[in-house]
């Protein structure tokens, strides 16, 4: 960009930021971080798509900062699905190590402690490696008393399986006599979801141009507003983040009515 273009861009971004942050923001934003591999191939011209995953992890650090700045109380990100285990072993190992390193980093991050961000993994812990489990427990233990912001990282996560697990828990409660079958409600199922501590997402954002939900928070996003952008996750800019929030602010949420 030239000097004039840069100045115009900065002016527009500052104006947009002021507009967005002076209006009510979503309480809970969920993000499907998509496009890392295509970014590596098409933007970095790299044969090793893991470079795209590294850039994606770096972008997540930025987006967490943006959410704190905007006072968005809950951020949930789709880091690794149960289906991702079917990818090439080398890529799976790289991704899980990336998440492991991130968890240890979050546990020691001054920004996390200064802003009192609670870190939590949502997903099936029984199928992740022990070293990743230890890293998750480290971050969670270090932040368990915080409640200003919640940062949920979905790992080994599948929306359908989450619902099945919740139904099993409720069914067991009925079987044990702790609950009557007539007491089964949406709330009783929601209380058995991984995200039971948080409100449902107000805004679900997906990058890379794909128009699908990919088994992510399918119970919780029943009334969420959806926002899709063609931009690959590592290329996602602050101005794109602001545009997504503005789009949410301009909608009339009807909650199915």
What are these regions (language model features)?
Residues 1-257:
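Flexible, compositionally biased loop and terminal segments
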């Amino acid at each position: 960009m030239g000097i004039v273009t840069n100045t115009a861009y900065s002016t527009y971004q500052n104006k947009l930021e002021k507009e967005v942050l002076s209006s009510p923001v979503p309480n809970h934003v969920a993000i499907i971080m998509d496009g890392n591999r295509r970014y590596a191939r098409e933007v970095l011209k790299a044969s090793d798509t893991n470079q795209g995953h590294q850039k994606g992890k770096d972008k997540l650090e930025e987006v967490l900062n943006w959410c704190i700045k905007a006072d968005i109380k809950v951020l949930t990100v789709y880091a690794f699905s149960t289906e991702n285990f079917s990818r090439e072993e080398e890529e799976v190992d790289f991704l899980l190590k990336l998440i492991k390193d991130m968890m240890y980093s979050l546990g020691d991050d001054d920004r996390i402690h200064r802003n009192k961000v609670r870190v939590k993994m949502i997903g099936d812990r029984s199928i992740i490696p022990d070293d990743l489990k230890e890293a998750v427990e480290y971050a969670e233990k270090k932040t368990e008393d915080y409640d200003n912001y919640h940062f949920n990282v979905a790992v080994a996560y599948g929306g359908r399986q989450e619902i099945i697990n919740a139904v099993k828990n409720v069914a067991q409660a009925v079987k044990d006599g702790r609950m009557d079958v007539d007491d089964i409600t949406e709330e009783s199922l929601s209380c058995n979801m991984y995200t039971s501590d948080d409100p449902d997402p107000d805004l679900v954002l997906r990058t890379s141009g794909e128009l699908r939900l990919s088994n992510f928070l399918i119970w919780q996003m029943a009334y969420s507003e959806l926002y899709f952008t063609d931009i690959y996750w590592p290329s996602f800019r602050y101005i794109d983040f602001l545009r997504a929030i503005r789009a949410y602010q301009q909608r009339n949420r009807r909650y199915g009515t």
